[in-house]
Amino acid sequence: MINNTVLEFERNEAGSNEGLGDPGVETFSNTPYYSAAKESGQNSKDAMSKGPVKMAFLLHKIKAEQLPLHDSLLETVNHCLNRKDVTENCDSKEKDFFTNAKMILNRAEIPVLEISDSNTTGLVGPAIDGKPFYSLLKGAGISDKPSITSNGSFGIGKDASFAISDLRTVLYSTLYKDASTGIESFLAQGKVKLASHIDSQGVARKRTAWWGYSGFQAIDKHLDVPCWMKRSEIGTSVFSIGFREEELWQHRMAAALLTTFFIAIVDKEMEFNVDNTISITAETISKYFEDPEIAAAAVESGSKEEFEFSKSLYKCYISSDSVDYEKDISASGVGSIGKFQIRVLKQKGLPKRVGFVRNGIFITDNLKNFNHPFRVFPRYSDFIALVSPLN
């Protein structure tokens, strides 16, 4: 058992009432598996050091005594069950959540989903303002991604991992190469988002906590984390504690990965292992686009249209019948936004739509923010077009 780490909630000096309704987490509550796969994939792609980026989505069953913040977390859940919103105002949503959380923590084993990557830079530290590790754990409304062409900014997307945790608890561990010394360095920390409460000493606490060294500090020694959090190669692991293990979760995540990263997969820039049962690579992607269970999972998660659209874009990308064009594109009030490649496939049954990709990732099917919806082409024969920037 790790005994020199602590779970610390911020003091609630203002006495504010903070419930479970965290805006970031709620954003992904309707599509938790799809969102967690997409957002984590974008972060790993942005951190690519060499190809292909290899990502794994693996379910572990961790013994309760191997979860270092277990006792503190259970104690906090009990405090949250004593909140007035639960005991007096009969907030059934909060009561149901914390009752379920208590049940999970009282089990002998706790489900944990690990989302890990390799062939990346890892979450570069140290754990100070201005570094990616700090931005992910403690940043709000800031970006420390390495490039303006990055596909995210550790913004609201980082909350997707909380949406698949029935304990609203996520732990992070990373191994990266220190730029000044060239030495591989380790960092780990955890974050918890519950509700404001009164602790066992009668001190008012906010809903957010960090697990690590005392004083909200990140862990920098492998010896101070359990074995399942250790890293042997450069990269990052994100652990959603109390993972919500619903039926077909693997296929829902696979649908998101195919929808979003099909170009990166074909170009051998990314590979995905989902629960050691689904292995998505350049050689297997066609098979999984035709997999009936993945297609059904896309329907169930409300992403059927996106999945089928990406499937058509994938056909356009790999087909020898597709035709390539180059064009400078301008936007009203902006002027030229650069040179783009437009790849077009004409074939009966295609949806007459245009898809935009960047850095090997599907971004959108329209430019409505630039006054160019590109959604309806009624007078054209069936086609699909794939647009990507060349500069």
Where are these regions (language model features)?
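Short linear interaction motifs
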Residues: 16-22, 34-40, 91-100, 109, ...
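Beta-sheet entry/capping signal
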Residues: 52-56, 111-114, 159-160, 168-171, ...
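Flexible phosphate/Mg2+-sensing switch loops adjacent to catalytic phosphate-binding sites
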Residues: 51-72, 170-215
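N-terminal assembly/transducer modules of large multi-domain enzymes
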Residues: 2-15, 25-35, 45-49, 202-391
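Short helix/loop capping segments that flank catalytic or ligand/cofactor-binding pockets
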Residues: 49, 65-68, 123-126, 163, ...
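Bergerat-fold GHKL ATPase/HATPase_c domain
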Residues: 1-116, 124-134
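Flexible ATP-lid and adjacent glycine-rich G1/G2 motifs of the Bergerat
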Residues: 85-183, 187-194
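Surface-exposed acidic, glycine/proline-enriched linker/cap segments
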Residues: 77-102, 138-145, 196-228
